[in-house]
Amino acid sequence: KEVERVFFNLQRISTEELEKRYDEVDVNMKWEDFKKRQQQGRRNIRVGVTVAASICLLITSGLWLWLGGAREERVVLAEQGRQNNVCLVLSTGEVVDISNAEQDEVKLDKGTKLYSGNRLEYVRPDSLHKKELEFNQLIIPKGTFYHLVLSDGTKVWLNADSKIKYPVSFGKDKREVSLHGEGYFEVAKDSTRPFIVSTDKMDVKVLGTTFDVNTYEDEGKSFVVLVEGLVEVSAGKGESRIITPGHMAEVNMYDVQAKIQVSKCDTEHYVAWKNGNFSFRNASLTEILKRVSRYYDVTVIREQVFEEEYYTGDVSSDVSLESLLAVIESSNSVSFKVERKIVYVQKKRD
């Protein structure tokens, strides 16, 4: 059975037991490497992040459909009728479906090259003296993982249900992109032009580093997790904090003053998605199902209200939706029913 192959190590923790064991959680646990793994309007808290680092984590605005929550479309033309396809919106407004490139290399536009295997690379040299930049937008649907190489050599891994807008070639003063969803960046070094990732909740400024950004709307917070180097986080009314490796800085999206909270964390847990892993630490069923919705491209509908349960574990990337739900169901008080692309969650009958 495939269920028997699921590497989940799932451990259920009741709410009461969680409170007793919370301080005992080992956040420095080691994990294997894996493979694969926007937005309701809420109070807009701008967070500035200046990075002098080698590796850090961030995540940007995303959305999980919970009981029919509506999703704001940034590029309507590209979204209509193309929800399951990877779309590239060119500077001319033309929308190109690049989901199923049959060739290993396809020239799209003045040096842009498309490679098969969910990878897009820009090889045009930077326009250091060009007055107006030409922007492209890459739209990644649910259930898809994509690799983008920008014109300066910066590598970006995009998680499911994400969008990134960027210049085809960067200008002479800075390199700036905007992100919705989640992206893991390996920024090419350039001491003369800082690299900026702009999101609805935070900005990240670097010269050459590797990081992952996270401000999914449905998570209720924006945060930065640092693996190497130093990061300066600024938010609210001029408050700023510097964090060191093994720590995270987070801002509650509902905090009007946008105070920054710094704490220790397991960095490998937060960057696991880039290598194709579900990684949970005392995660509620609600949190798990949010990720299930994004990764498997399904809508989750919770038909009843019941007490939350918490889990610790991980799942390899080749597990089917049915197998994952079967494992969760075997150690949970809920049952699942899958009809096409909808997962119904029900409380088990006694």
Question: What residue ranges belong to the model's regions?
Answer:
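Positively biased amphipathic helices and basic secretion/translocation or surface-docking motifs
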Residues: 13-47
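N-terminal amphipathic alpha-helical interaction or autoinhibitory segments
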Residues: 1-12
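Hydrophobic core
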Residues: 57-59
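Alpha-helix initiation and N-capping motif
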Residues: 3, 27-31, 266-267
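Short helix/strand-capping connector loops at secondary-structure junctions
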Residues: 11-18, 306-311
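A residue-level detector for the "anchor" residue at the start of short, highly conserved motifs
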Residues: 34, 43-51, 61-350
